[in-house]
């Protein structure tokens, strides 16, 4: 089965076929680094990561570009408020974005590019637009796009803009469909604002031109997939299409993939409601990065996700169940031999996961077969039906699953330490929960090191050196490692 994706441009599910045989070129709108990213932002970034991982697993060579918007209205306003240059202000939040991605196991794109490194290209492209009469200069030195010159304007957002506000202008970056006007490509400088000197004069780019230029520079005038959150369909992505296609006369992106918003406890996320959470907020509250990632992946990207704290607890239980299963099949002394039934179950699991992801990245559907496998193999192991020769096929099924979901081989303790260090540096030590502090203590305590300590604990008990075995158990407990005695020996798990 081939990958099928819902294409916002056509309004239907289509079979994905790259423009070039085995290479996928895709562009994702990245962060606007004016503040710490919230969990709604990271739902979108995890959707991008899921598609990226699945394309690679499916054998495609990938060229994935993500931008960093490091100049826009909000950034300029906030930098001025804090008495900093744009560069000084955004450096902090760009670093924070990368730290949050690392915590959530979001892979880096092949290229992560800053808007401010491409301002000359933006200015030259605007000059081309002016020469083609699809852009015009105003008295103050700003440039605007003539939406009346692009008859297909509205084809992405499915709204007919014909004759609407003809010739009127809007100079803010974000606005509603009913306020559609000629939009700003280049903004003349205001006193005290950041500005750049270019072939079209002094000023700064509008938000929409940034992504057109960076995507076409690295991926070409036509590329395979453009991704973002549903809030970007209009005006941002609509304007990207208009700018790009009015000059190149080529289809800008073949597929447009948009993820839905999320709710928090059934309500729209809002600082005024007290339900606005960043990734590091959740980590400091004691929630594992793997649980956050799992919950954000548990609902298909085109469905609204209701992010709840009960859901986070259930996600933690689910991840622990998977990790405990993996640990069991790696460490349990199964009898020699092979049970063909177990190998068949493992192979069927791999097939079902792929089929679910081919079905418009249906992550919820992909989770079901892995938990069916865990249930059935645990029951078989309890009955003595799993053999040593079955372990490789079971581990392969887990590996294929985790190439996409990325929650099994994660050291949550190591992922948590950055948030604790950040809280201490920012004077927010009071926000560090006891659970988070405990996890941070285990930073660097790898599975291999835990295994070595567990083996030493078992050897000490066998030698009746109970003082040493108790000391090891206490050391592990302090680092969030729980030991369990079973008929097959000692097992361990992280809290």
Swiss-Prot record:
EC numbers for this chain: 6.1.1.16
One Pfam family in the UniProt entry: DALR_2
Cofactor: binding comment: Binds 1 zinc ion per subunit.
Gene Ontology terms for molecular function: ATP binding; cysteine-tRNA ligase activity; zinc ion binding
Annotated signal peptide: none
Cited SUPFAM superfamilies: Anticodon-binding domain of a subclass of class I aminoacyl-tRNA synthetases, Nucleotidylyl transferase
GO BP term (any one): cysteinyl-tRNA aminoacylation
Subcellular location: Cytoplasm
Main location: cytoplasm
Binding site for Zn(2+): 29, 211, 236, 240
Motif ('HIGH' region) on chain: 31-41
Cofactor(s) demanded: Zn(2+)
UniProt binding sites for ATP: 271
Assigned keywords, A-Z: Aminoacyl-tRNA synthetase, ATP-binding, Cytoplasm, Ligase, Metal-binding, Nucleotide-binding, Protein biosynthesis, Zinc
Group of enzyme by EC: ligase
Gene Ontology cellular-component terms listed: cytosol
Motif extent ('KMSKS' region): 268-272
Catalysed reactions, semicolon-separated: tRNA(Cys) + L-cysteine + ATP = L-cysteinyl-tRNA(Cys) + AMP + diphosphate
Assembly behavior: Monomer.
Family named by the database record: Belongs to the class-I aminoacyl-tRNA synthetase family.
Protein name: Cysteine--tRNA ligase
Source organism of the structure: Koribacter versatilis (strain Ellin345)
Phylogenetic classification of the source organism: Bacteria, Pseudomonadati, Acidobacteriota, Terriglobia, Terriglobales
